[in-house]
């Protein structure tokens, strides 16, 4: 690959003692890197490893330059053609392919001594300087753009002023030449020299004008690219903030202790079984309540029959009352007429006995009706209390059943969501493990090759 020429193995590192940017503290670097889609810790920056620096710089190249493994797949495939076991050298080829874009990015950021040893053998000091350069470049590129526009405007104004001065001088010289031609004198040596200087200045002005046009075109292109990069960085920063909270929440399940995942699944299964048991018990209780309601309906029919019987007793009591009134009327008639015959006396005695029997019967009926009224009232009051209790209990059971069913559905949805999420996390962890194994194999191959 052509870009390997500028990273020799024995290249000496040079320190940029007069950097055009401030070196940021570690904590500020950790806060700024999520804007470049890089999630790091202070411990990783203070003790960097080759693998960590390579993955971080690859992510920075993807965020700022739009370079990733997919965009470089054709070139990497062409390099891997004809080699044995190309998959073992895939990361190494990707590492070398990123050197030229990273070198250009660091040079644009103000770091001119970047080389591949900064990835293979990283040091905390140089890593801090390089990350400070990239962060300052990404943070203050708009300020540099304004400074560039200001300098371009000043250059344009200066160029216009010089053009006007040269045009005025040219006009004066042209008039002087015409005057000399009119008087027929030979132009002196100064005039010839002045023409030569004017020609050189014209060529210089033309060159500056072309250069200014090129700078303006480049500025317009850079402005559009910078706007796209800024919008993409803002969007990615928002996504990283939301993902950072999600990763922190899932970290205890996937990274710290994978057994927590299995325990959580077992706990969810137990809770689902408990909810199933509660729902079954509630169903049985609802069935019992339905039976109680049916019994109460039967009792209502019995009460209706009792009320009909009470109505009949009332009608009979009214008939007896009419008979009593009739007997009383007859008694009064007998008293007024004064019948003295035995038949009248006997009839009176019979009527008196009938009256007494009717009165006793009426009294007994009234007593029975009073007792029946009291018993019916007590029974009705007791039934009303039972109905209220049954209605309240049934409403409570129905509410508990609905709540249990809703909670069970939520638990099933949460369990399905958590299961999918855990499976995705486990899949990512397996892929990361496979990638680490591949890198270890490459590393051992590289170490073996160097030892040989």
Swiss-Prot record:
State the GO CC annotations: Ndc80 complex; nucleus
Q: What does this protein do?
A: Acts as a component of the essential kinetochore-associated NDC80 complex, which is required for chromosome segregation and spindle checkpoint activity.
Q: Provide the family line.
A: Belongs to the NUF2 family.
Organism of origin: Yarrowia lipolytica (strain CLIB 122 / E 150) (Yeast)
GO biological process per UniProt? attachment of mitotic spindle microtubules to kinetochore; cell division; kinetochore organization; meiotic chromosome segregation; mitotic spindle organization
Q: Name one Pfam family in it.
A: Nuf2_DHR10-like
Q: What protein am I looking at?
A: Probable kinetochore protein NUF2
One annotated GO molecular function is:
protein-containing complex binding
Q: Where in the cell is it found?
A: Nucleus; Chromosome, Centromere, Kinetochore
Swiss-Prot/TrEMBL keywords = Cell cycle, Cell division, Centromere, Chromosome, Coiled coil, Kinetochore, Mitosis, Nucleus
Query: What is said about its interaction partners and assembly?
Result: Component of the NDC80 complex, which consists of NDC80, NUF2, SPC24 and SPC25.
The encoding gene is: NUF2
Residue ranges the record marks as coiled coil? 152-280, 339-447
